[in-house]
Amino acid sequence: MTHRFFLILLSTIPFLASAQKLQVTVFGGFSNYQGDLQDKRFTMSQAHPAFGAGLLYDITDKLSARANITLGKVSSDDKKSAKNAVRNLSFSSPVTDMHLGLEYSLFSLYERSLTPYIFAGVSYFSFNPSAKDTAGNKVFLQPLSTEGQGFYQDRKKYSLNQFAIPFGGGVKFALSENIRLAFEIGMRKTNTDYLDDVSTTYVDEFLLFVNRGQQAVD
């Protein structure tokens, strides 16, 4: 089973909310996806804006606890890939990601103006994959059960809320005593194989028609 990666490239601006410990962060950047419909970890042609906010609490001068919420979008379209153009599949999904974790800096920004850092944690995210039908109308894919989820053998209907493991790293700069700027690359290894609504195989068209109607077959 191929799991998905939710990749976020962030430019982060933390503002110190207190003189020593707590920082409020705001950030913007790009979100991307890797999975059954996209084998590259990052492709600018299918990247989307992402933004969010969070809190960073300094446990020590190098170790911090972080809590973020990120709003983004992931998608893939075979029309943009010469390799997969004949397959002609596509999807798009908004993603809301809430993450708790720890961040470790190699150096203290109280002593230096620059430090690399890494982070890891746990996140809970929501998604809702959709595609366009033959008339160009947006259709949400989960209710269609195109792989028989919910009615075929042991294929259970998947939840639109899942857990993931976030991890990554970046470089942080102390612009002043109260403002820090960070450039960060992060991934989310998801706990679902249905971020793009593709996992195993499609079921028989007649069986799909009987259970979910003509729209699912189309």
Say what each PLM segment does.
Residues 26, 53-57, 100-104, 120-122, ...:
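Residues on the lipid-exposed face of transmembrane beta-strands in outer-membrane beta-barrel proteins
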Residues 22, 62-65, 178-181:
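Repeated loop/turn-to-beta-strand initiation elements of outer-membrane beta-barrel proteins
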Residues 63-145:
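Gram-negative (and chloroplast) outer-membrane scaffold detector with strong preference
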Residues 19, 60-62, 107-111, 174-176:
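Outer-membrane beta-barrel channels and translocator barrels
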Residues 34-42, 83-91, 151-157:
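Extracellular loop and loop/strand-boundary signature of outer-membrane beta-barrel proteins
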Residues 45-49, 94-98, 114, 161-165:
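Residues that define the transmembrane beta-barrel architecture of outer-membrane proteins
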Residues 19-58, 129:
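Short glycine/proline- and aromatic-enriched beta-strand/turn motifs that initiate or cap beta-hairpins
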